């Protein structure tokens, strides 16, 4: 008998989707543009930087044809600030995600370049893992990107051992918050759980646990509602019998 498929994305599927994130590379060799399903990649001309999908950047790194520039949020100073934010400043919430990119007009006023578009872009189509990404804010695929860069381009990351330690601390803190935040759902159907700033891998790993808690709360609420209705029906039946006796003069 085959087991049912798990609901949602598995961690391996999330890691596969993460490979579409754009990262910044410094090419060592010239490379012409490549036609991909997602569009045409920029032509690589050393030493000019270019943004490429993560999977292609890792492939060029393995071939020693490019170096990967880690995003600013993967710097040790930035990770220390995020850990401080998670453990000291906001012990119940998560670090805020990076803001949408802003572009200055002719008058110097910043605006969202995608505001006029009908399509709302989200990761991996936002530059949240390139060298222009803001520091101090974790993107949606922060954990997967960090693991892949440390596995395949650790020599391009400054203080890689310290980065690994900070990422481990950050993962443990956020995992504990994810487990404790489900206590907000114990109040019934009105329980609300904020997921702003939670990453893709964290959602995939906690999906089964959170869904189990929500389903248990739903069953408890349904049982309570059924009991209340039965009591109301029994009370209504007794009142009808008493009214009938009064009408008959008994």
From Swiss-Prot:
Main location: nucleus
Cited InterPro entries: GINS_A, GINS_bundle-like_dom_sf, GINS_Psf2, PSF2_N
Compartmental location: Nucleus
Superkingdom of origin organism: Eukaryota
Gene Ontology cellular component annotations, sorted alphabetically: GINS complex
Lipoprotein among keywords: no
Acidic residues bias: start-end ranges: 231-250
GO BP: any one term: double-strand break repair via break-induced replication
KW Nucleus (keyword) present: yes
Positions of the UniProt region annotated as Disordered: 220-250
Keyword terms, alphabetized: Chromosome partition, DNA replication, Nucleus
Subunit architecture: Component of the GINS complex which is a heterotetramer of SLD5, PSF1, PSF2 and PSF3.
Protein purpose: The GINS complex plays an essential role in the initiation of DNA replication. Has a role in chromosome segregation.
Family: Belongs to the GINS2/PSF2 family.
Protein name (Swiss-Prot/TrEMBL): DNA replication complex GINS protein PSF2
Organism: Gibberella zeae (strain ATCC MYA-4620 / CBS 123657 / FGSC 9075 / NRRL 31084 / PH-1)
UniProt gene name: PSF2
